Amino acid sequence: MQIKQIEGALSAKDARFALVISRFNDFIGQKLMEGAIDCIRRHGGSEDNITIYRCPGAFELPMVAKKAALTGKYDALITLGAIIRGSTPHFDVVAAEATKGIAQASLETGVPIAFGVLTTENIEQAIERAGTKAGNKGFDAALTAIEMVNLYRNM
């Protein structure tokens, strides 16, 4: 007996994506968006198959992602933003709720939603993860979305 293995290819050809981006810490979100679009392009995707939704902050990402997923227009979504620790517990609340909400939206809709939201201790760490020393986490999230689209297609 041979074990069957199913996985997703890294081809964005004909895949439709929604990018849901937090405007808070927008200069970081912009860099993450550029990374995600670059990834989709490099893997055969078309800008014509990308829609961008902008919301006020990371707390709103799950709501917008779920509504976009429910339209049936997208094969996958990519959530992008930056939550940077400050001097109050606000960071912990927003980071936890955004993370849980995005996962819940994906589970409830059955549409893959990739998590490209940075949670960092300071602005320097966010900048590093948005295209400098630590790569671009928007690119990485898009790569996850591409793989998930193809995995779902193969199931």
Swiss-Prot record:
One GO-annotated biological process of the protein: riboflavin biosynthetic process
Encoding gene (name): ribH
Function: Catalyzes the formation of 6,7-dimethyl-8-ribityllumazine by condensation of 5-amino-6-(D-ribitylamino)uracil with 3,4-dihydroxy-2-butanone 4-phosphate. This is the penultimate step in the biosynthesis of riboflavin.
InterPro entries (UniProt xref): LS (IPR034964), LS/RS (IPR002180), LS/RS_sf (IPR036467)
Similarity-based family: Belongs to the DMRL synthase family.
Protein name: 6,7-dimethyl-8-ribityllumazine synthase
Class in the EC hierarchy, top level: transferase
Binding site for 5-amino-6-(D-ribitylamino)uracil: 24, 58-60, 82-84, 115
A cellular component term, taken from the record's GO annotations: cytosol
Gene3D superfamilies: Lumazine/riboflavin synthase
Pathway(s) served: Cofactor biosynthesis; riboflavin biosynthesis; riboflavin from 2-hydroxy-3-oxobutyl phosphate and 5-amino-6-(D-ribitylamino)uracil: step 1/2
Keyword DNA damage attached: no
Active site: 90
UniProt-listed NCBIfam families: lumazine-synth, PRK00061.1-4
GO molecular function: 6,7-dimethyl-8-ribityllumazine synthase activity
Keyword Transferase part of the UniProt annotation: yes
Ligand binding ((2S)-2-hydroxy-3-oxobutyl phosphate): 87-88, 129
